Amino acid sequence: MKRGELELLIYLITSAQGLPGEPRIYGSIRLTEAAYKLCRILQEREPENEKLKALAERLEQDKGKALSQEEDFWNMLQDVSGMLVECM
């Protein structure tokens, strides 16, 4: 297992551990961060994949809006869902 993959696994497990008692939106924030980390791992394997790069950039750009601009955050998730189809 590569370092980035192990770090993602650690992040997922510790995030799941921390969820009880946290606001509901935190789950979506953590999943979005995990998706971004996975995009970065995949980009290391496919650095020429422009669609994957665009997906990672969009996640990075708007993932912080969950608490201050929640509607924009949900719209970003809709957009990146469509971008995922293009990555297939």
For each predicted feature, which ranges?
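Amphipathic alpha-helical binding modules
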Residues: L59-M88
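Alpha-solenoid helical-repeat scaffolds
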Residues: K2-L6, I25, I29, E46, ...
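Short terminal alpha-helical segments
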Residues: M1-Y26, Q78-M88
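Amphipathic alpha-helical interaction modules
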Residues: G18-E60
